[in-house]
Amino acid sequence: MRVKGSDVSDGATVRLLEIYERLLAHHGDRRWWPADTAEEVIIGAILVQNVAWKNVERAIAQLRARGWLTLAALHEAPTEDIEESIVSTLYYRMKARKLKTFAAMVEAEFGGDVNLLLALSAAELRARLLAVWGIGPETADDIVLYAAHQPSFVVDSYTRRIFFRLGVTREQATYDELRDFFMRHLPSDVGLYNQYHALIDALGHSLCLSRRPRCGECPLQSLCPSYARPLLPSGVSHCGAGSPS
């Protein structure tokens, strides 16, 4: 989506929207999240923790083949069989427990109806998700945004790397500080948050790499103080960065 008619008087807002428009022009519509149902989004959000999406796709295919792409099915399925189906996602034993725990919560508190959970307000839903074992801030925000279709900006390692190199945020900023920064300076729009997060991940995966970033191909090079400046061996930029405010 393109942002029209937004209040862009704030300097940080202007910069964030310019970054967004450049990423959109370069990468196009990402059409993310690739799932058919809200439950599939939730399952994928848990499985993708600390692993590449291609690994999750294999696990999703295995779960689909067994008819286990619903929380009700996972609630009834043997843990060992779930583990066998999701082995491609790494940490598969822990992730099987996380899936079972989440499914049990929906069954116990919402009568097995995930739509009742997702109907909570964004703030209530996020708080309830964070109270579930195995659900951290990024996974919670994935579920709020992509399953419940409510505004909650998702932050990941790509977000941290890219916006530190751009001089927009501090390297040591916490997850909540980064999330609050984006939500304070961007219009509260589900489509915008959805697309922006997907575009950030596209850039981080293809060009703004942790080591040897491909700066010469980056659509943000003219905005980036790290462009054409050497990186430390760790891949961290030499440039300074401002605080999220």
Name each model-derived stretch.
Residues 1:
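Phosphate- and other anionic-substrate recognition elements at nucleic-acid/protein interfaces
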Residues 4, 11-238:
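Catalytic cores of DNA base-excision repair glycosylases
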Residues 245:
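Acidic, metal-coordinating catalytic segment for phosphate/diphosphate chemistry
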